[in-house]
Swiss-Prot record:
Gene that this sequence comes from: DBN1
Entries under Gene3D superfamilies matching the protein: Severin (3.40.20.10)
Composition-biased stretches (Basic and acidic residues): 211-236, 288-298
PANTHER family: CORTACTIN AND DREBRIN, DREBRIN
Annotated organism of origin: Gallus gallus (Chicken)
Protein's name according to its UniProt entry: Drebrin
Native organism taxonomy: Eukaryota, Metazoa, Chordata, Craniata, Vertebrata
Key words of the record: Acetylation, Actin-binding, Cell junction, Cell projection, Cytoplasm, Developmental protein, Differentiation, Neurogenesis
Length: 652
């Protein structure tokens, strides 16, 4: 808030003030008010009529100040009164603004004794104002007090002074001294100020240095942090590159190993194929199928009515020149297409055996002749059936001799085990067609024995000394008519009993009654071990399946056996199959199933043996025997046969 202003009308205000306080001036009052629209104080009016005249000049719309001199009769000097007039119509805001101006106006007009606040004429009462002025100043009415006052006035002495004449020298010294101290004080202040500035500068420099050091340290930390980050990133990149390189190396090694494995597999496959092709090529060189030899032997055995005594067996190793090992090797398209179907033989360990041509006792042609005459081409050995066991079992297994008027083989009922073989044995018609008086050439070579690789399909063992024939007093077992002598029985015989119905000439030996088949010479299906699984197994199974399909396809064709054999098969009653170790019925029927040679070398086992079928018009399936002779027979189809060892007589 702005204060009251005296500068605008200062001279006028002071002049009117001097007129009021002057003893010689007739003016005893002055009236002041504000200039329009401002707080500057100015003189409004003045006069000599006292309070009564002054009270007539106040206005109710303004704020005004009246300065008046009042003379009291009891007082020697006049008193001064300041009247603060605030009209009733003045706004409140203006009243508040001017309330603070009263003290400054009283200070400007020096000597004011009483300040009277008035808003109407009634508030300006001369008697009341005089009373206020006379409080404490009236003359004491007590005479004692009056005498005391007079006595004090009489005893009053003049007042002394301390004024002295001014000495310039002293004054100069004093002034100089004061100036010196003032100068010293100023210099001290300047020095302190400079020290403060220096301290401030030092503090500022320290702060700047500290901030610079902190900045450098921060930059160093950031640099180390960046370097650490770069090292970590570089290490991470190296680790990733190493991992990628290791992954590529592993993939490369895996690819190399995979390629090597594939190359090994391809080489193994090519080697297997080459072995298969070599075996197939060697097998394909055979001019005839050895299976025909077995069929011919079965024809001879079925045609012969004489039995061979079991006691005439010779000891020694078993000679098997007709073992068919071609089927034990892997089959091929050339062998299956160039040779007729063959009965599958069991697989025996595929390793090469030494040349066995020296073990053959005779050539194939001589062998065929001897077989027709009742001479066994290969004797039994402990590998197939022990001789002692055969001799001990023979008396127990003998059956009563049948009457001489027993039915012929053409009408004899054959048991299912024998009929299932269906060997192409010659019947009575075939026998009649042969010239009875023709003597076979002592050493002819049959057409089927020609070829350099026939010996590769046969295995023989050197025979030992033949055992003596049984005594004549011993009862000769009579073979049931109509049942063909098994091929193994022909091998075990010593040639003493010639075949009765054979068309070939027989040696001059007494024909004994036929003997029943020995139970000990048969092999049961339960006694056969499972052949080892080797390389030749898979191909052998495939060959077996192919041959079975061909046999089923040719089942409806006429069988090459004789009519008598067929009639005996068709008319014979059903007889349960005789397994190994069983005895045939003693009523003159077949005592034991005719045992084909190839059955000993067949592939079938207990789980693979076909169930016996009912007799029907179609040709029955051949019987497969599980247990081969206990001899070391190997797959040696690929073994070349020397030219000088082609004949069977090299071993004699």
């Amino acid at each position: 808030m702005a204060g009251v202003g005296f500068a605008a009308h200062r001279l006028e205000l002071l002049a009117s003030y001097q007129d009021v306080i002057g003893e010689d001036s007739p003016t005893d009052w002055a009236l002041y008010t504000y200039e329009d629209g401002s707080d500057d104080l100015k003189l409004a009016a003045s006069g000599g009529g006292g309070l009564l005249e002054l009270s007539g000049h106040f206005e109710i719309q303004k704020v005004m100040y009246g300065f008046c001199s009042v003379k009291e009769p009891q007082a020697v000097l006049p008193k001064y009164v300041l009247v603060n007039w605030v009209g009733e119509d003045v706004p409140d805001a203006r009243k508040c603004a001017c309330a603070s101006h009263v003290a400054k106006i009283a200070e400007f007009f020096q000597g004011v004794d009483v300040i009277v606040n008035a808003s109407s004429v009634e508030d300006i009462d001369p008697g009341a104002i005089g009373q206020r002025l006379s409080n404490g100043l009236a003359r004491v009415s007590s005479p004692v007090l009056h005498r005391l006052r007079l006595r004090e006035d009489e005893n009053a002495e003049p007042v002394g002074t301390t004024y002295q004449k001014t000495d310039a020298t002293v004054e100069m010294k004093r002034l100089n001294r004061e100036q010196f101290w003032e100068q010293a004080k100023k210099e001290e202040e300047l020095r302190k100020e400079e020290e403060r500035k220096k301290a401030l500068d030092a503090r500022l420099r320290f702060e700047q240095e500290r901030m610079e050091q902190e900045r450098l340290e921060q930059e160093e930390r950031e640099r180390r942090y960046r370097e650490r980050e770069e090292q970590i990133e570089e290490h991470r990149r190296k680790q990733q590159s190493m991992e990628a390189e290791e992954a590529r190396q592993r993939l490369k090694e895996q690819s190399i190993f995979g390629e090597q494995q594939e190359e090994d597999d391809r080489q193994q496959l090519r080697k297997s194929e080459s072995e298969v092709e070599e075996a197939a090529a060697i097998i394909a060189q055979r001019p005839d199928n050895p299976r025909e030899f077995f069929k011919q032997q079965e024809r001879v055995a079925s045609g012969s009515g004489d039995a061979i005594s079991p006691g005439s067996h010779r000891t020694g190793r078993l000679h098997c020149p007709f073992i068919k090992t071609a089927d034990s090797g892997p089959p091929s398209s050339s062998s299956s297409s160039s040779s007729p179907p063959r009965t599958p033989f069991p697989y025996i360990t595929c390793h090469r055996t030494p040349n066995l041509s020296s073990f053959f006792p005779c050539s194939q042609s001589d062998y065929r002749k001897v077989s027709a005459a009742g001479c066994s081409p290969c004797e039994s050995s402990p590998a197939s059936t022990p001789l002692g066991e055969q001799r001990t079992r023979a008396p127990a297994e003998e059956t009563p001799a049948t009457p001489k008027d027993s039915p012929s083989p053409s009408t004899q009922v054959a048991e299912p085990a024998a009929t299932e073989q269906h060997w192409p044995f010659p019947g009575p018609e075939d026998k009649a067609a042969e010239p009875p008086g023709d003597e076979p050439d002592p050493d002819p070579r049959p057409a089927w024995t020609a070829g350099a690789d026939v010996l590769g399909d046969l295995v023989t063992l050197e025979p030992s000394e033949p055992s003596p024939a049984p005594a004549a007093s011993e009862p000769q077992p009579v073979e049931t008519p109509g049942v063909a002598e098994p091929l193994i029985e022909l091998w075990q015989s010593d040639g003493a009993a010639p075949a009765a119905t054979s068309t070939w000439p027989l040696p001059d030996t007494p024909a004994g009654p036929p003997v029943p088949p020995e139970e000990g010479t048969l092999l049961g299906l339960d006694e056969l071990p499972e052949p080892p699984a080797t390389f030749c197994d898979a191909e052998q199974h495939e060959e077996v399946e192919e041959e079975e399909e061909e046999e089923e396809a040719t089942a409806g064709e006429p069988h090459p056996t004789g009519l008598g054999y067929q009639e005996g098969y068709q008319e014979g009653p059903e007889v349960p199959p005789i397994t190994n170790g069983e005895m045939g019925p003693k009523d003159g029927t077949a005592g034991r199933g005719e045992q084909a040679s190839e059955g000993y070398f067949s592939q079938s086992q207990e789980e693979e043996a076909p169930p016996p079928e009912e007799p029907s018009a179609k040709a029955p399936q051949p019987v497969f025997y599980n247990k081969p002779p206990e001899i070391d027979i190997t797959c040696w189809d690929t073994d070349p046969l020397p030219e000088e060892e082609e004949s069977f007589g090299g071993g004699l």
